[in-house]
UniProtKB/Swiss-Prot annotation:
Family: Belongs to the globin family.
Entry-linked Pfam families: Globin
Gene this chain is encoded by: CTT-7B5
Native source species: Chironomus thummi thummi (Midge)
GO CC annotation, single: extracellular region
Secretion signal, residue range per the UniProt entry: 1-16
Protein name from the UniProt record: Globin CTT-VIIB-5/CTT-VIIB-9
Additional note from the record: There are at least 12 different components in Midge globin. There are at least nine genes for VIIB variants.
Sequence ranges assigned to domain Globin in this UniProt record: 18-161
Keywords: Heme, Iron, Metal-binding, Oxygen transport, Signal, Transport
Complex formation: Homodimer.
């Protein structure tokens, strides 16, 4: 998986302060509301942070409008969202903590090999949260659940970069 498996950042981490069942439910339900918009999610990230787009050789240096409707873009966006969906589905159940940790650890290892920085993970987080805020019912409780999930994920990913 390429850089945008980074969407795993929107997921529940299985460390220090795992999500409660209620927090996981908020993350899962808000993700379910947008997870069918794979192309739009990836396009929003690329539009906000072109440096992330340039990490992908097949998309680097190209106008976003010219690639957004291509099969390659849709395929890649679907891979990312599917990965995210898998990890999000595992959230909120302590018996799944090892699986989440394994998936997110591999994400960090894979992205270290590609030269992805902690700052770029931060950019991705910012773009993803902005997309969610604009496209789901977003209150303080949803924001807190996503922030906790992302903080937990960063605690696993960043040391591996």
């Amino acid at each position: 998986m390429k850089f945008f498996a980074v969407l795993a950042l929107c997921i529940v981490g299985a460390i220090a302060s795992p999500l409660t069942a209620d927090e996981a439910s908020l993350v899962q339900s808000s993700w379910k509301a947008v997870s069918h918009n794979e192309v739009e999610i990836l396009a929003a990230v690329f539009a906000a942070y072109p440096d992330i787009q340039n990490k992908f050789s097949q998309f680097a240096g190209k106008d976003l409008a010219s690639i957004k409707d291509t099969g390659a873009f849709a395929t890649h966006a679907t891979r990312i969202v599917s990965f995210l969906s898998e990890v999000i589905a595992l959230s909120g159940n302590t018996s799944n903590a090892a699986a989440v940790n394994s998936l997110v650890s591999k994400l960090g290892d894979d992205h270290k090999a590609r030269g992805v920085s902690a700052a770029q993970f931060g950019e991705f987080r910012t773009a993803l949260v902005a997309y969610l805020q604009a496209n789901v019912s977003w209150g303080d409780n949803v924001a807190a659940a996503w922030n906790k999930a992302l903080d937990n994920t960063f605690a696993i990913v960043v040391p591996r970069l």
